[in-house]
Amino acid sequence: SLVALGFVLIFKASGVFNFAQGAMVLFAALTLVRLMELLKHTFSPFLIALLLTIAVMIALAWVIERLVLRSLVNQPGISLFMATLGISYVLDGFGQAVWGSDVYMLDVGIPKRPIVLLESVVKGGVLVSSEDLVAAVIAGLLVAILGVFFQKTRIGRALRAVADDHQAAQSVGIPLNYIWLVVWSVAGLVALVAGIVWGSKLGVQFSLGLVALKA
């Protein structure tokens, strides 16, 4: 569901399925875990690496908007879809070239032991993975926050207008390039959250990008 939020964000802004979201999850997780290793002697490796990774994902959104999306304004949806496919392959290759292809363990303090719920309702209770429970809670919070963002904020309403009709949105003064920069930045941050949750559960490896298929 965390990966699905990234799909929804891009779809709402462009009406196009973002094939690169899984690659963004992997790239964000790889960047975080490798920066944590490089900063392991600092006072707070996770916090510093997290802030740097956020900056990297926002910079990535800027590069994507400037080099790819800007030239595809008012182009058919299939062109945008093919662009996201290309972005996916570039991110996979770039991530492997920069950070390597090993499997990395990511420990962010999420408990590994399962939790027993509803013992008073079901005999023996229901066994739930702590990591899955944390992921569900985070996904619920993000859905609520993004719902308010799309419905109540000026930028959110502009995003919906852009998704409906790029040309009409531009004709009323909505800056399409800025909107795409915002939505890809937010999608990158959602990918980072998904990468942290799934990376702590499965390890940070190149198959992590396949979690997008579960969305």
Outline where the language-model segments fall.
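Hydrophobic alpha-helical segments embedded in the membrane of multi-pass proteins
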Residues: 1-6, 23, 27, 192-193, ...
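Interfacial loop-to-helix junctions that mark the boundaries of transmembrane helices
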Residues: 40-51, 73-75, 120-135, 203-207
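Hydrophobic alpha-helical transmembrane segments
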Residues: 23, 27, 46-55, 81-83, ...
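Short loop segments and helix-boundary regions at transmembrane helix junctions
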Residues: 11-20, 59-104, 149-161, 213
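Helix-loop-helix "hairpin" substructures at the membrane interface of multi-pass membrane proteins
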Residues: 123-205
